[in-house]
Amino acid sequence: MEVTAKLIDFANANATVKIAQGAIKAEVEKLAKKASKTMKMDGFRAGKVPVAAILKRYEKELTRDAEQDLLRNAVDGALKEVKKDAKDLVGEPYFEKFDRKDGAIEAQMVLSFRPEVKLDGYEELVPTYNTPKVTQKEIDAKKEELLKRFATPEAIKEDRALKEGDFAKFDFEGFVDGKAFDGGKAQNYVLEIGSKQFIPGFEEGMIGLKIGEEKDINVTFPKEYGATHLAGKDAVFKVKLHEIQELKLPELNEELLKSLLPEEKEPSVEKLEAKLKEQLKNEKIFKLINDELKNQFAEALVAKFDFVLPKNIVEQETDMQFRSSLRNLSEEELKEFKDEAKYKEKRESFKEDAQKSVKLTFIIDELAKLRNVTVSDQELIQAIYFEAYRYGFNPQEHLDNYKKQGALPAIKMSLIEEKLFADIFKKNDKKKTEKESEK
């Protein structure tokens, strides 16, 4: 095997590899001999399978494994030539050429390494912002939202029609093609009007009903409805309204205050409002960071700092962005890319954005190190569990699915990014200015 390698720049090296047919055959023989000591095969005792029998049945698989082993050895050889360590490698080698001829291999590959990233003066790029002001009206609305969690529906006494936000107690029965269907009937059912728990059109059809009134509501089941025998079909629901209920907010007494402010020895309405004000301010800052500041800062970082990028990572990102764009094209539009020149031209159009994306990833990684921002495995699991609870998934299954997809590193990186920007833009960061103003 011949390996020659040369550094192109700090982050990339070119390597030329030539593996003779004899070297591949010798490696195949070596793997076959090793397998013969443990392999079981009908007609032979375990560990006594002849090498010839193994080669006859598994030569294709052994050749593939042998080539992979030799290419790994070639990478090791290339690293020695350019005086780099395996721990410096990022991503997989990028093959610019890979030819098989007469059982031999000739390849040209690019090995990429972690770039040298220096961010001197990055603090000057952090955008300034005005601290959002929270109004009493917003605090009152937040307080009402909080109290609604402890509210209970109570029947109204006034004579009025059902409106959005009310709770309706009613009987209903559904019919498709004039026939009642399973699961389409209930009595004294309680439903919040406007909650969209029922199929589209049902809750809207109930608005305006008064207690004791009956009505036929015409709806159409969604095409993607879970019960396939009903999906896409027209239906009629016969309903009778028995009671209209409104949420009654609880009194903000000492007992409720204690449950809302368990950390306070002497809880009060004033302390609750102060806590809600702080929450609202943080929510506004978080929104401001995500909607504006983060993008401004990221663009400034990418524009100011320049360093050599790992070619293989850029190529991978280019491929990913290109393939993602193809998913949005029609079959007719996709036909255009059967032309190799147009295919390459379209793929190349994503190169600049890919370079910016890769550069930002390494900048964020370096910033996280500079500011000692980390995400523990426990924090990662908690974030995934929280996501599962939000969407009604089984937490452990949700975590396992991400593991199978190999998505944990990407999720961890996104959490580090979120934590990093929160740290950079936090209130007591002396590297930015704040002015009190109403947002």
Swiss-Prot record:
EC number(s) reported in the record: 5.2.1.8
GO biological process terms held by the UniProt record: cell division; protein folding; protein transport
What does the record give under GO molecular function? peptidyl-prolyl cis-trans isomerase activity
For this protein, the record's Gene3D superfamilies field holds: 3.10.50.40, Trigger factor ribosome-binding domain, Trigger factor, C-terminal domain
What reaction does this catalyse?
[protein]-peptidylproline (omega=180) = [protein]-peptidylproline (omega=0)
Q: What are the GO cellular component annotations? A: cytoplasm
Localization of this protein: Cytoplasm
Q: Where are the transmembrane segments?
A: none
Looking at its record, which EC class is this enzyme?
Answer: isomerase
* UniProt cross-references to SUPFAM superfamilies, sorted A to Z: FKBP-like, Triger factor/SurA peptide-binding domain-like, Trigger factor ribosome-binding domain
Q: Using the record, list the residue span of the signal peptide; answer none if the entry has no such feature.
A: none
Family matches, as InterPro entries:
PPIase_dom_sf, PPIase_FKBP_dom, Trig_fac, Trigger_fac_C, Trigger_fac_C_sf, Trigger_fac_ribosome-bd_bac, Trigger_fac_ribosome-bd_sf, Trigger_fact/SurA_dom_sf
Q: Identify the residues that the record assigns to the PPIase FKBP-type domain, covering every copy.
A: 165-250
Q: Which domain of life is it from?
A: Bacteria
Alphabetized UniProt keyword annotations: Cell cycle, Cell division, Chaperone, Cytoplasm, Isomerase, Rotamase
Q: Which Pfam families match?
A: FKBP_C (PF00254), Trigger_C (PF05698), Trigger_N (PF05697)
Regarding protein family, the annotation reads: Belongs to the FKBP-type PPIase family. Tig subfamily.
Its domain description in UniProt is: Consists of 3 domains; the N-terminus binds the ribosome, the middle domain has PPIase activity, while the C-terminus has intrinsic chaperone activity on its own.
Its biological purpose is as follows: Involved in protein export. Acts as a chaperone by maintaining the newly synthesized protein in an open conformation. Functions as a peptidyl-prolyl cis-trans isomerase.
Q: What is this protein called?
A: Trigger factor
Record lineage? Bacteria, Pseudomonadati, Campylobacterota, Epsilonproteobacteria, Campylobacterales
